[in-house]
């Protein structure tokens, strides 16, 4: 069964083998290199049915926390991702982009916006440790808009879908945890409210 074709909504996969997202830190300036393009093509050529890309930083000023992670907010980056997608599809693979906001893992001084601190639900990176910027409602809207914009770009580039990174203490996960989300508005309190941010993300239309 694992090697049989599989219908995933509007995508037909040649098998049920999926490559998980793995950060590679090989995209200086946020632009995937020729080596990155070749890397993904090789995986498709080896008959991986579905490839989920490494985390792509959302086009938001506070999304980054690590060097040489790819982005979508430049012409050069978009063109490079088009080549990644073409390489995968030319080898009969399918590909989903993973969008990633690092939240409180970001520190002042990090590129590409060294003056911008990390953003979290309540300014906390762990219970009692407030070292980040507490997101306002405007910040939350801007972040959701950034996800929506990047999802649209992914569609235009030719990705088969988008996955949103929601684990490991990054921004979305930070909203889920009662120890790091002590907000008193519609995005904090009950688990339903702490899930409101990701719920809003899931409802974006592109």
Role assignments for model-derived ranges:
Residues 100-159:
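Non-globular sequence segments
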Residues 14-17, 48-57, 117-122, 161-175:
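Short coil-to-beta-strand
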Residues 204-206:
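Conserved small/polar residues in nucleotide/adenosyl-binding loops
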Residues 67-75, 132-141, 189-192:
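The substrate-binding groove and active-site-proximal loops of carbohydrate-active enzymes
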Residues 30, 144, 187-200:
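Active-site glycine- and acidic-residue-rich loops that bind
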Residues 53-76, 101-111, 164-188:
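Glycine-rich, proline-tolerant flexible connector loops at the mouths of alpha/beta enzymes
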Residues 39, 80-84, 139, 143-151, ...:
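Alpha-helical packing segments of well-folded alpha/beta enzyme cores
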Residues 1-102, 143:
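N-terminal capping/small domains of soluble enzymes
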């Amino acid at each position: 069964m694992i090697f049989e074709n599989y219908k995933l909504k509007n995508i037909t996969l040649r098998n049920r083998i999926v490559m998980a997202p793995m950060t590679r830190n090989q995209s200086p300036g946020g632009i995937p290199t020729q080596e990155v393009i070749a890397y993904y093509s090789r995986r498709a050529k080896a008959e991986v049915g579905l490839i989920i890309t490494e985390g792509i930083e959302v086009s938001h000023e506070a999304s980054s926390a690590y060097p040489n992670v790819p982005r979508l907010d430049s012409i050069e980056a978009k063109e490079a991702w088009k080549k990644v997608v073409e390489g995968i599809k030319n080898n009969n693979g399918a590909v989903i982009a993973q969008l990633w906001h690092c939240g409180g893992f970001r520190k002042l001084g990090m590129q590409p916006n060294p003056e911008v601190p990390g953003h979290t639900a309540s300014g906390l990176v762990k219970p009692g440790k407030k070292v980040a910027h507490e997101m306002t409602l405007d910040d939350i809207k801007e972040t959701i808009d950034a996800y929506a914009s990047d999802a649209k770009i992914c569609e235009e580039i030719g990705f088969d879908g988008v996955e949103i990174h929601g684990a490991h203490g990054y921004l979305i996960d930070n909203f889920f945890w009662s120890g790091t989300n002590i907000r008193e508005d519609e995005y904090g309190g009950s688990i339903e409210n702490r899930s409101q941010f990701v719920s809003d993300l899931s409802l974006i239309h592109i």
